[in-house]
Regions:
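Helicase motor core with emphasis on the C-terminal RecA-like subdomain
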Residues: 3-12, 16, 20, 24-36, ...
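Conserved catalytic helix of short-chain dehydrogenase/reductases
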Residues: 68
Length: 245
């Protein structure tokens, strides 16, 4: 493991070492390899690309599907003293120019944006003239027709290899079948990417299936017996209100 990566981990995140599944991902990124990594939710995927970006020169471009996710990561990075920007919402031309000027001058270490931004010629032109370290496709399963969370806008990411042929591409996901994995590699044009799979087992979660006649009576017994936090899914808002009473 790169010694500077460990220093950055300790300084900004307060940890002494990486999780076992994180180390090979970070090593691959630091070596400049195209990488596809699969880690469970809560497995520390963001750290896998954030730490190497702090080691490398340039701005890390992150494509993400959700505004809330981008804003949350930018806030967390800012609280750690790390400069990050998310291009969200309808930004006036002059304001977008100002922000992109700052990006081009490397005022930010991380630039987050939705895939739709890649359709903006103003943004794309500036990106091509910005010293980027590598490109991260977060929630990469959204690019696949075979995935349940397919987003057509993610298909814009297919052109990233054409636009930035020398930049490493890092695809991250918490869930991907073999077919979706193949789709990700093909569509992002990273067929020789290093593929790293962490265990998707969640030891803190337990799943059980019951066949019951009176579901509300059984639910009451389960909740009474289980003293820990519980989540109950129902079909509509009316049922949530009835259940809460």
């Amino acid at each position: 493991m790169h010694p500077l990566a460990l220093e950055i981990l300790k300084k900004h995140w307060g940890y002494d070492q990486f999780r076992p599944a994180q180390e090979p991902i970070i090593d691959a990124i630091l070596q400049g390899k195209d990488t596809m990594a699969m880690l469970p939710t809560g497995g520390g995927k963001s750290l896998c690309f954030q730490v190497p970006a702090m080691v490398k020169e340039g701005v890390c471009l992150v494509i993400s599907p959700l505004i809330s996710l981008m804003e949350d990561q930018v806030r967390n990075l800012s609280e750690k003293g790390i400069s990050a920007l998310a291009l969200t919402g309808n930004i006036p031309f002059y304001e977008l120019e100002r922000l992109l000027n700052n990006v081009q001058s490397e005022a930010y270490k991380f630039l987050y944006m939705a895939p739709e931004r890649l359709n903006n010629e103003q943004v794309l032109y500036r990106l091509k003239h910005t010293p980027l370290s590598y490109i991260v496709i977060d929630e990469a399963h959204c690019i696949s027709h075979w995935g349940k969370d397919f987003r057509p806008s993610y298909l814009e990411c297919k052109r990233l290899r054409e636009w930035f042929p020398s930049l490493p591409i890092v695809a991250l996901t918490a869930t991907a079948t073999d077919r979706v994995q193949e789709d990700i590699l093909q569509l992002l044009q990273i067929p020789k990417a290093i593929v790293i799979k962490g265990s998707l087992a969640r030891p803190t979660l337990a799943y059980m299936t019951y066949y019951i006649e009176d579901k509300w009576e059984r639910l009451g017994r389960i909740l009474t017996k289980n003293k820990e936090s519980s989540i109950v899914y129902v079909r509509n808002r009316r049922l949530t209100e009835e259940l809460a009473q």
